[in-house]
A protein has these predicted regions:
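DEDD superfamily 3′-5′ metal-dependent exonuclease/proofreading module
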Residues: 1-280
Length: 280
Protein backbone atom coordinates (compact mmCIF):
# COMPACT_ATOMS: atom_id res chain seq x y z
CA UNK A 1 0.00 0.00 0.00
CA UNK A 2 2.92 2.33 0.64
CA UNK A 3 4.10 1.83 -2.93
CA UNK A 4 0.64 2.92 -4.04
CA UNK A 5 1.00 6.15 -2.03
CA UNK A 6 -1.21 5.06 0.87
CA UNK A 7 0.32 6.04 4.21
CA UNK A 8 -2.70 7.13 6.24
CA UNK A 9 -6.46 6.67 6.39
CA UNK A 10 -7.14 9.81 4.36
CA UNK A 11 -5.19 8.33 1.45
CA UNK A 12 -7.74 5.55 1.01
CA UNK A 13 -10.31 6.50 -1.64
CA UNK A 14 -13.58 4.69 -2.52
CA UNK A 15 -11.83 3.06 -5.47
CA UNK A 16 -8.40 1.40 -5.38
CA UNK A 17 -5.42 3.14 -7.01
CA UNK A 18 -4.20 1.63 -10.31
CA UNK A 19 -1.35 -0.19 -8.60
CA UNK A 20 -3.87 -2.08 -6.44
CA UNK A 21 -6.53 -2.91 -9.01
CA UNK A 22 -6.18 -6.59 -8.18
CA UNK A 23 -7.57 -5.73 -4.72
CA UNK A 24 -10.88 -4.52 -6.18
CA UNK A 25 -12.95 -7.42 -4.87
CA UNK A 26 -12.24 -6.55 -1.22
CA UNK A 27 -11.40 -2.86 -1.54
CA UNK A 28 -14.80 -1.81 -0.23
CA UNK A 29 -13.99 -3.51 3.09
CA UNK A 30 -10.67 -1.67 3.27
CA UNK A 31 -12.32 1.66 2.54
CA UNK A 32 -15.08 1.11 5.11
CA UNK A 33 -12.52 0.08 7.73
CA UNK A 34 -10.58 3.30 7.09
CA UNK A 35 -13.78 5.35 7.47
CA UNK A 36 -14.59 3.60 10.75
CA UNK A 37 -11.05 4.14 12.04
CA UNK A 38 -11.11 7.86 11.19
CA UNK A 39 -14.44 8.26 12.94
CA UNK A 40 -13.32 6.32 16.03
CA UNK A 41 -10.14 8.34 16.33
CA UNK A 42 -11.98 11.64 15.90
CA UNK A 43 -14.39 10.62 18.68
CA UNK A 44 -11.62 9.44 20.99
CA UNK A 45 -12.93 5.86 20.85
CA UNK A 46 -9.72 4.03 21.73
CA UNK A 47 -11.66 0.87 22.53
CA UNK A 48 -12.22 0.49 18.78
CA UNK A 49 -8.48 0.16 18.24
CA UNK A 50 -7.77 -2.20 21.13
CA UNK A 51 -10.52 -4.43 19.73
CA UNK A 52 -9.42 -4.24 16.09
CA UNK A 53 -5.64 -3.85 16.17
CA UNK A 54 -3.52 -6.95 16.57
CA UNK A 55 -1.80 -6.99 19.99
CA UNK A 56 1.54 -6.60 18.23
CA UNK A 57 0.34 -3.35 16.61
CA UNK A 58 -1.08 -1.66 19.70
CA UNK A 59 2.13 0.30 20.21
CA UNK A 60 0.53 2.69 17.72
CA UNK A 61 -1.94 3.70 20.43
CA UNK A 62 0.94 4.54 22.75
CA UNK A 63 2.49 6.65 20.01
CA UNK A 64 -0.71 8.63 19.52
CA UNK A 65 -1.98 8.79 23.12
CA UNK A 66 1.03 8.46 25.42
CA UNK A 67 0.14 11.69 27.23
CA UNK A 68 -3.35 10.29 27.97
CA UNK A 69 -2.11 6.91 29.17
CA UNK A 70 -2.20 5.67 32.77
CA UNK A 71 0.17 2.91 33.85
CA UNK A 72 -1.22 0.48 36.42
CA UNK A 73 0.22 -2.19 38.69
CA UNK A 74 -1.19 -4.21 41.58
CA UNK A 75 0.23 -6.14 44.52
CA UNK A 76 -1.54 -9.06 46.20
CA UNK A 77 -1.46 -10.91 49.50
CA UNK A 78 0.13 -13.95 47.84
CA UNK A 79 1.54 -14.98 44.48
CA UNK A 80 0.18 -18.52 44.16
CA UNK A 81 -2.90 -18.90 46.35
CA UNK A 82 -6.20 -18.71 44.51
CA UNK A 83 -7.85 -16.86 47.39
CA UNK A 84 -5.31 -14.04 47.62
CA UNK A 85 -6.56 -10.49 47.45
CA UNK A 86 -5.33 -7.15 46.18
CA UNK A 87 -3.43 -5.16 48.78
CA UNK A 88 -2.22 -2.21 46.72
CA UNK A 89 -2.91 -0.57 43.37
CA UNK A 90 -0.86 2.29 41.98
CA UNK A 91 -1.68 4.24 38.83
CA UNK A 92 0.79 6.66 37.22
CA UNK A 93 -0.34 9.17 34.60
CA UNK A 94 3.15 10.40 33.81
CA UNK A 95 2.94 13.16 36.39
CA UNK A 96 1.01 12.02 39.43
CA UNK A 97 0.86 8.78 41.39
CA UNK A 98 -2.58 7.59 42.47
CA UNK A 99 -2.38 5.08 45.32
CA UNK A 100 -5.07 2.70 46.56
CA UNK A 101 -4.46 0.52 49.63
CA UNK A 102 -6.70 -2.16 51.12
CA UNK A 103 -8.78 -1.05 54.11
CA UNK A 104 -7.93 2.58 53.34
CA UNK A 105 -9.23 3.61 49.93
CA UNK A 106 -8.99 0.52 47.71
CA UNK A 107 -12.75 0.58 47.14
CA UNK A 108 -12.36 3.93 45.33
CA UNK A 109 -10.42 2.34 42.48
CA UNK A 110 -13.37 1.33 40.24
CA UNK A 111 -14.64 4.92 40.15
CA UNK A 112 -11.12 6.14 39.39
CA UNK A 113 -10.83 3.57 36.60
CA UNK A 114 -13.84 5.10 34.85
CA UNK A 115 -12.03 8.44 34.53
CA UNK A 116 -9.14 6.99 32.49
CA UNK A 117 -8.65 7.06 28.71
CA UNK A 118 -6.13 4.26 28.18
CA UNK A 119 -4.42 1.92 30.64
CA UNK A 120 -1.15 0.04 30.28
CA UNK A 121 0.07 -2.94 32.28
CA UNK A 122 2.76 -5.59 32.05
CA UNK A 123 1.15 -9.03 31.84
CA UNK A 124 -2.07 -7.40 32.97
CA UNK A 125 -4.15 -9.47 30.55
CA UNK A 126 -3.49 -12.61 32.58
CA UNK A 127 -2.78 -11.22 36.06
CA UNK A 128 -3.67 -7.63 37.01
CA UNK A 129 -6.95 -7.22 35.15
CA UNK A 130 -8.52 -10.59 36.10
CA UNK A 131 -7.56 -9.86 39.72
CA UNK A 132 -9.15 -6.41 39.52
CA UNK A 133 -12.34 -7.83 37.97
CA UNK A 134 -12.57 -10.44 40.71
CA UNK A 135 -11.74 -8.04 43.56
CA UNK A 136 -14.39 -5.50 42.56
CA UNK A 137 -16.88 -7.88 40.94
CA UNK A 138 -16.55 -6.19 37.55
CA UNK A 139 -17.91 -7.94 34.41
CA UNK A 140 -15.15 -6.35 32.35
CA UNK A 141 -12.53 -3.62 32.36
CA UNK A 142 -14.29 -0.49 31.05
CA UNK A 143 -11.13 1.15 29.70
CA UNK A 144 -9.01 0.36 26.60
CA UNK A 145 -5.96 -1.65 27.62
CA UNK A 146 -2.50 -2.28 26.20
CA UNK A 147 -0.35 -5.08 27.62
CA UNK A 148 3.35 -4.25 27.27
CA UNK A 149 4.31 -7.88 27.70
CA UNK A 150 3.15 -8.71 24.19
CA UNK A 151 4.56 -5.54 22.67
CA UNK A 152 7.91 -6.48 24.20
CA UNK A 153 7.60 -10.05 22.95
CA UNK A 154 7.14 -8.82 19.40
CA UNK A 155 10.36 -6.84 19.80
CA UNK A 156 12.17 -10.01 20.97
CA UNK A 157 12.11 -8.86 24.59
CA UNK A 158 10.90 -11.64 26.86
CA UNK A 159 10.71 -12.42 30.56
CA UNK A 160 9.37 -10.47 33.51
CA UNK A 161 9.40 -6.71 33.83
CA UNK A 162 12.71 -6.74 35.73
CA UNK A 163 14.38 -8.68 32.89
CA UNK A 164 13.03 -6.20 30.36
CA UNK A 165 14.44 -3.34 32.44
CA UNK A 166 17.90 -4.91 32.43
CA UNK A 167 17.82 -5.42 28.67
CA UNK A 168 16.71 -1.82 28.09
CA UNK A 169 19.13 -0.40 30.71
CA UNK A 170 16.35 0.96 32.91
CA UNK A 171 17.59 1.37 36.49
CA UNK A 172 15.36 1.68 39.52
CA UNK A 173 16.27 3.68 42.62
CA UNK A 174 18.79 1.75 44.70
CA UNK A 175 16.61 1.36 47.79
CA UNK A 176 14.07 -0.78 45.89
CA UNK A 177 16.27 -2.21 43.14
CA UNK A 178 16.26 -5.72 44.59
CA UNK A 179 12.64 -5.76 45.76
CA UNK A 180 10.30 -8.21 44.03
CA UNK A 181 6.77 -9.59 44.25
CA UNK A 182 7.63 -11.96 47.08
CA UNK A 183 8.94 -9.03 49.11
CA UNK A 184 5.69 -7.17 48.44
CA UNK A 185 3.75 -9.96 50.15
CA UNK A 186 6.08 -9.83 53.16
CA UNK A 187 5.86 -6.03 53.34
CA UNK A 188 2.06 -6.19 53.36
CA UNK A 189 2.07 -8.70 56.21
CA UNK A 190 4.49 -6.53 58.18
CA UNK A 191 2.14 -3.58 57.79
CA UNK A 192 -1.10 -5.49 58.36
CA UNK A 193 0.09 -7.55 61.31
CA UNK A 194 2.82 -5.50 62.95
CA UNK A 195 1.87 -1.88 62.24
CA UNK A 196 5.18 -1.40 60.39
CA UNK A 197 4.74 1.95 58.65
CA UNK A 198 8.08 1.71 56.88
CA UNK A 199 6.94 -1.57 55.34
CA UNK A 200 3.75 0.09 54.09
CA UNK A 201 5.69 2.91 52.49
CA UNK A 202 8.16 0.55 50.83
CA UNK A 203 5.29 -1.57 49.50
CA UNK A 204 3.62 1.46 47.92
CA UNK A 205 6.96 2.69 46.59
CA UNK A 206 7.73 -0.68 45.01
CA UNK A 207 4.32 -0.84 43.33
CA UNK A 208 4.70 2.76 42.16
CA UNK A 209 8.14 1.97 40.74
CA UNK A 210 6.57 -0.71 38.56
CA UNK A 211 4.20 1.85 37.05
CA UNK A 212 7.02 4.31 36.36
CA UNK A 213 9.02 1.52 34.77
CA UNK A 214 6.07 0.81 32.46
CA UNK A 215 6.26 4.37 31.15
CA UNK A 216 10.00 4.03 30.53
CA UNK A 217 9.55 0.68 28.76
CA UNK A 218 6.79 2.18 26.61
CA UNK A 219 9.12 4.99 25.54
CA UNK A 220 11.85 2.49 24.68
CA UNK A 221 9.41 0.50 22.55
CA UNK A 222 8.44 3.63 20.64
CA UNK A 223 12.13 4.25 19.99
CA UNK A 224 12.48 0.69 18.68
CA UNK A 225 9.59 1.38 16.30
CA UNK A 226 11.31 4.61 15.18
CA UNK A 227 8.37 6.75 16.21
CA UNK A 228 8.68 10.50 15.92
CA UNK A 229 6.63 13.20 17.65
CA UNK A 230 6.64 11.27 20.93
CA UNK A 231 5.50 13.58 23.78
CA UNK A 232 8.48 15.11 25.54
CA UNK A 233 9.82 13.43 28.65
CA UNK A 234 9.33 15.82 31.57
CA UNK A 235 12.61 15.16 33.35
CA UNK A 236 13.28 12.14 35.54
CA UNK A 237 10.02 10.20 36.09
CA UNK A 238 11.51 8.48 39.14
CA UNK A 239 11.09 11.78 40.97
CA UNK A 240 7.38 10.97 41.15
CA UNK A 241 8.28 8.55 43.96
CA UNK A 242 8.84 11.63 46.13
CA UNK A 243 5.04 12.02 46.14
CA UNK A 244 4.74 9.01 48.45
CA UNK A 245 4.42 10.48 51.96
CA UNK A 246 6.73 9.50 54.75
CA UNK A 247 5.30 7.04 57.25
CA UNK A 248 2.86 8.61 59.69
CA UNK A 249 2.70 7.30 63.21
CA UNK A 250 -0.98 8.23 63.52
CA UNK A 251 -2.08 5.99 60.65
CA UNK A 252 -4.26 3.06 61.67
CA UNK A 253 -3.39 -0.44 60.60
CA UNK A 254 -5.79 -2.44 58.41
CA UNK A 255 -6.93 -4.41 61.45
CA UNK A 256 -7.58 -1.18 63.35
CA UNK A 257 -9.50 0.20 60.39
CA UNK A 258 -11.72 -2.86 60.27
CA UNK A 259 -12.34 -2.57 64.01
CA UNK A 260 -13.26 1.11 63.66
CA UNK A 261 -15.57 0.40 60.73
CA UNK A 262 -17.28 -2.42 62.64
CA UNK A 263 -17.73 -0.18 65.69
CA UNK A 264 -19.19 2.61 63.55
CA UNK A 265 -21.62 0.12 62.01
CA UNK A 266 -22.71 -1.11 65.46
CA UNK A 267 -23.12 2.47 66.68
CA UNK A 268 -25.22 3.39 63.64
CA UNK A 269 -27.53 0.41 64.15
CA UNK A 270 -27.86 1.18 67.86
CA UNK A 271 -28.79 4.82 67.14
CA UNK A 272 -31.39 3.71 64.60
CA UNK A 273 -32.89 1.26 67.12
CA UNK A 274 -33.10 3.90 69.88
CA UNK A 275 -34.67 6.46 67.56
CA UNK A 276 -37.26 3.90 66.50
CA UNK A 277 -38.14 3.17 70.17
CA UNK A 278 -38.52 6.89 70.92
CA UNK A 279 -40.99 7.29 68.04
CA UNK A 280 -43.11 4.49 69.49
Amino acid sequence: MRQAGIRQWDDIEPNPPPLLNNWSYFWEDIYNAAVDAREAFANGNLQFFTQNLKPSDRWRLLHLKLNQTTFIDIETSGLESLDNYITTIVAFDGQKLHTFVKNENLEDFPDFLLTLKLIVTYNGSTFDLPKIMREFNLPNIPVPHVDLRWLCHNCFLDGGLKNIEKTLNIKRPEDIRGTDGNDAVILWNQWANSNDHNARRKLVKYCAADTISLLLVARKLLEIHHCDNVPDDDGDPWRALDQIPQSKTNQTTPVQNETCNTQHSINDRLKAFLNKKRRH
